[in-house]
């Protein structure tokens, strides 16, 4: 299993590839609450 930091790195690399317009912090934090502490405060 990917660690919290590792998952966060993959997440942001994916965001950079596809664009922020396709992502929503609140939806993602709700879908994966275990990763919420790793998300930068927006």
Swiss-Prot record:
GO terms for molecular function: toxin activity. It is found in: Secreted. GO terms for cellular component: extracellular region. Expressed by the venom duct. The keyword Disulfide bond applies. One of its GO terms (biological process) is lipid catabolic process. Heterodimer of an alpha and a beta chains; probably disulfide-linked. This is Conodipine-M beta chain. It comes from Conus magus.
């Amino acid at each position: 299993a990917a660690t919290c930091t590792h998952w966060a790195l993959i997440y942001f690399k994916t965001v950079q590839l596809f664009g922020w317009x396709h992502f929503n912090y609140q939806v993602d934090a709700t879908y994966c609450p275990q990763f919420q502490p790793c998300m930068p405060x927006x």
